[in-house]
Amino acid sequence: MSESLKNSQQFGNVYKNGKSFANKYLVMYVCKNELSINRLGISVSKKVGNSVVRHRISRLIRESYRLNDSISNSGLDIVIVARAGSKGKNYSEISSALMHLAKLHKIISSSEPDRN
């Protein structure tokens, strides 16, 4: 189960105190929170494309996270920033990039299969 990060103060806290890893499509920041659930924030800047493109990438990231949510640790604030390279990519590429970053952050174990 997870919720969303709601305001810029919550995002700023994750950027400031969290640890980040990146690949060519996404950057993931992770910071512990005081809750028993994960909170997810997604950021897609105007550099990536117009609103249609940005919203599509946001939906792909959210869906990939949702389908793999049951295998993740709890009590984390996670911010995922889409890079310009993510423009035009399909679900499997975004999901694979997200799972790669989750393994680097040790949110999921590397023995768990991708669910895409």
Swiss-Prot record:
Gene Ontology biological-process entries: tRNA 5'-leader removal
Family: Belongs to the RnpA family.
GO MF entry, a single one: tRNA binding
Subunit record text: Consists of a catalytic RNA component (M1 or rnpB) and a protein subunit.
HAMAP family: RNase_P
Catalytic activity: Endonucleolytic cleavage of RNA, removing 5'-extranucleotides from tRNA precursor
A GO cellular component annotation in the UniProt record: ribonuclease P complex
Enzyme category, top tier: hydrolase
Function: RNaseP catalyzes the removal of the 5'-leader sequence from pre-tRNA to produce the mature 5'-terminus. It can also cleave other RNA substrates such as 4.5S RNA. The protein component plays an auxiliary but essential role in vivo by binding to the 5'-leader sequence and broadening the substrate specificity of the ribozyme.
Keywords: Endonuclease, Hydrolase, Nuclease, RNA-binding, tRNA processing
EC numbers for this chain: 3.1.26.5
Protein name: Ribonuclease P protein component
Protein origin, superkingdom: Bacteria
